[in-house]
A protein has these predicted regions:
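Extramembrane terminal tails and long inter-domain/linker segments of multi-pass membrane proteins
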Residues: 1, 41, 194-222, 318-329, ...
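Short, small-residue-biased leader/transition segments that mark boundaries at the very start
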Residues: 2-9
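Transmembrane-helix bundle segments that line or gate the permeation/cavity pathway
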Residues: 11, 20-30, 72-95, 102-103, ...
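Extracytosolic (periplasmic/ER-lumenal) interhelical loops and adjacent juxtamembrane/interface segments
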Residues: 23-67, 132-160, 251-280
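Individual transmembrane alpha-helix segments
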Residues: 60-72, 156-177, 274-300
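Contiguous transmembrane helix-bundle modules in multi-pass membrane proteins
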Residues: 301-302, 309-327, 333-421
Length: 460
């Protein structure tokens, strides 16, 4: 299965379950008395949005399953985009002529993260309300225009009265429409440019080897869709996610423990947790760097670097050629090491989003954990870069990364010294084979279709 399939298929699950949820959800922050079937909350004053979400979970047939499928599909969708983009980056599939598609993929990832956060905020429970409060503070931290921006989006001071209605419009209509349009553009460019491929028998820069669209590719895609839907349904049925009835309604005076955001927001939460207190005053405006840097500057640097990387690599290497064959990651050490460093940084920040759990589990002061995570944030990415660079250089120095090195055997000289000498090569001994056996190609460059394998070669 291609990465595009993996990324696109959860969209259909999100759309189907989202329509179901929209039939019952009410984005109202008006206080009502809950009288539903969930006994611990009966008689409490909650927002109508929270009450309707609880009703959807306990009083609507199949409602909880739909909620969980929607949530799990969102996580699968974002995770698939991340994995797909990592594959594209490490193999160099973003190079000319696919720079535009790379930018579209970056934009899709950004929109998916933003839309996931908007949907996560709609139930108005304690955790999502806390996330909204953090988002409001991040908007306030924008230098110069933060106050105006926060008031414009929230319709006034936090929590406001119309923010959920606005978020629902963005979450259910505006951003999904943009995502669908960009997925369509992504697929159009993919069909027009054809897919990339690793070097191999019969594969050149001027042709493309793969399965025909119909029936092979469409059959695989249909089967894979049902596989994704089945896995999502099983996860939703047996693995609980976002149990808002346990969190309760949002209350600014309450906090929660051992509750982290979805994984795609973990790096941002971790960065905010470990950022040291640091503020400056410039032109009469207070700049809270403990919020501005981890929540605005750092994500901007990461995503900005992703956008400009194709042009940056082209400028540094002077490579302006068109590429349809992929690189082995080991053949481009700088690129691979840079990607590994960024991934290491996000992993460390993701772990930092659980500082409270780590401190409690290890019985260590929270302040100590914060200091340790700050140090790791600084030293782990360079270490990851250096180690990855050395590994790639070692693999690149070998003529073929998959070739076995010539084995040695230990021999004793007449003087009693032990030395390593190359072992004798035996043609009939696979253990001493210096290079892998070439498996016959499914197709040859002179034939278009191999009926036995269903593969096809076409000119670009």
């Amino acid at each position: 299965m291609t990465g595009v399939q993996t990324c696109a298929l959860p969209i259909f699950i999100l759309l189907a379950t989202g329509v179901f949820l929209a039939l019952y959800y009410v984005p109202s922050q008006v206080q009502v008395t809950y009288n539903g079937s969930y006994a611990p909350l009966q008689g409490q004053r909650v927002t109508e949005a929270f009450a309707k979400t609880i009703d959807l979970s306990f009083d609507v047939r199949g409602g909880l399953l739909m909620r969980q499928m929607h949530h799990w599909a969102c996580n699968i969708f974002v995770g698939a985009i991340v994995v797909h983009m990592a594959r594209v980056f490490f193999t160099g599939a973003f190079r000319k002529p696919r720079e535009l598609n790379w930018s579209i993929g970056n934009t899709l990832l950004t929109l998916a993260i933003v839309n996931g956060f908007l949907g996560y905020s709609l139930p108005d429970d304690l955790v999502s309300g806390t996330g909204l409060r953090i988002a409001y503070s991040i908007l306030l931290a924008v230098p110069g225009v933060g106050t105006y921006l926060a008031f414009w989006i929230f319709g006034g001071n936090f929590p406001g009265e119309i923010v959920l209605s606005r978020f629902l419009i963005l979450h259910a209509l505006v951003i999904p429409g943009i995502i669908l349009a960009m997925v369509g553009a992504h697929l159009f460019l993919l069909v027009r440019q054809k897919h990339t491929q690793f070097p191999g028998p019969g594969r050149t820069e001027n042709n493309v080897v793969g399965s025909p669209m119909f029936p092979v590719f469409m059959g695989k895609t249909t089967g894979f869709f049902f596989l994704v839907a089945g896995v999502t349904a099983l996860l939703s049925a047996f693995v609980q996610i976002n149990p808002i009835w346990l969190f309760g309604p949002y209350d600014a005076a309450k906090i929660s423990y051992a509750v982290q955001p979805d994984f795609y927001m973990g790096f941002l939460d971790g960065a905010l947790r470990i950022a040291p207190a640091w503020q400056t005053v410039a032109f009469g405006h207070n700049i809270p760097w403990e919020v501005t840097f981890p929540a605005l500057i750092l994500p901007g640097l990461i995503f900005g670097l992703a956008y400009v990387w194709p042009a940056l690599e082209r400028k540094i290497t002077g490579d302006n050629e068109i590429h349809h064959l992929l690189d082995r990651p080991s053949q481009v050490p700088i690129r691979t090491a840079s990607g590994a460093a960024v991934l290491a940084l996000t992993v460390v920040l993701f772990i930092a989003s659980s500082t409270d759990v780590i401190a409690n589990f290890l019985h260590i002061s929270l302040n100590t954990i914060l200091v340790v995570m700050r140090v790791l944030t600084v030293i782990v990415p360079p270490i990851a870069f250096y180690v990855t660079m050395k590994i790639c250089q070692e693999l690149r120095d070998v003529d073929n990364a998959s070739r076995r090195k010539t084995p040695n055997m230990v021999s004793r000289t007449a003087e009693g010294e032990y030395v390593a000498v190359p072992a004798p090569h035996h043609e009939d001994d696979a253990h001493h084979e210096e290079s892998p056996i070439h498996v016959p190609a499914f197709i040859s460059e002179t034939s278009n279709v191999d009926e036995s394998s269903g593969t096809r070669t076409v000119e670009r």
